[in-house]
């Protein structure tokens, strides 16, 4: 299911690291609605867990201009959250319904949209947020790299296994159709202290691609997202 949240920025701007702002909002909503569920999802034995979470999201702006550290937003801000988890869907929908504002974001509407189904073992998708793939050395992979499909399969297998207890039923075959490189600039807690750099850059890709694999896998991945940092606003996809 997809949850569509619309709103506006009261001060007409949002940090360039808006994905982190939206993730913080999502975590706050889950925590306020069900603290034990939040602890189960984001912590293990009192410590933050790196375990993948069953959701992804994308953000869209109307009438905006990107500056060095901020995005000036005159129009609507739309957040699209996707998850195959029924409980999480309920928690997020009810939480957003109760929420009036978060920081400078003022909510105007919330609605649920049914997912379209993949009917065969292949489909053409579009990205709603950029896909980020890295190798075993944490190096971002170019889409032309011979290991791109291998690593995409690796991360898809992890997210499926985390959600349903087992991974891919069949290998995925990713074919770019009309993809372009997108460099995403993020300000992440702890990164500046370690590197003395304010921003980290993610080389990712947006556009249209063909994906072949098991039909059930494709339907779940459409809701879970693909690649790395899905829970931080990357890898959200939909049927074209």
Whereabouts are the PLM-identified features?
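RNA-interacting cores
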Residues: 1-240
């Amino acid at each position: 299911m997809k949850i569509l949240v619309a709103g506006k920025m009261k001060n007409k701007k949002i940090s360039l690291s808006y994905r982190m702002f939206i993730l913080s909002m999502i975590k706050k909503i889950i925590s306020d609605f069900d603290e034990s569920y939040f602890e189960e999802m984001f912590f293990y034995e009192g410590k933050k867990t790196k375990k993948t979470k069953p959701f992804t999201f994308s953000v869209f702006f109307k009438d905006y201009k990107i500056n060095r550290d901020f995005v000036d937003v005159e129009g609507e801000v739309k957040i699209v959250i996707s998850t195959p988890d029924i409980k999480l869907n309920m928690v997020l929908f009810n939480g957003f319904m109760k929420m009036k504002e978060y920081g400078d974001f003022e909510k105007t509407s919330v609605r649920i949209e049914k997912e379209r189904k993949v009917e065969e073992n292949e489909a053409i998708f579009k990205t709603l947020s950029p896909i980020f793939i890295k190798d075993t050395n944490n190096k971002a992979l170019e889409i032309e790299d011979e290991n791109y499909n291998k690593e995409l399969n690796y991360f898809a297998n992890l997210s499926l296994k985390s959600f349903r207890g087992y991974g891919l039923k069949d290998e995925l075959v990713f074919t770019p159709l009309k993809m372009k490189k997108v460099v995403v600039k993020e300000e992440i807690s702890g990164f500046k202290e370690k590197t003395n750099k304010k921003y980290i850059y993610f080389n990712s890709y947006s556009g249209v691609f063909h994906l072949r694999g098991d039909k059930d896998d494709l339907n779940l991945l459409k809701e879970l997202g693909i690649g790395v940092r899905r829970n931080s606003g990357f890898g959200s996809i939909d049927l074209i």
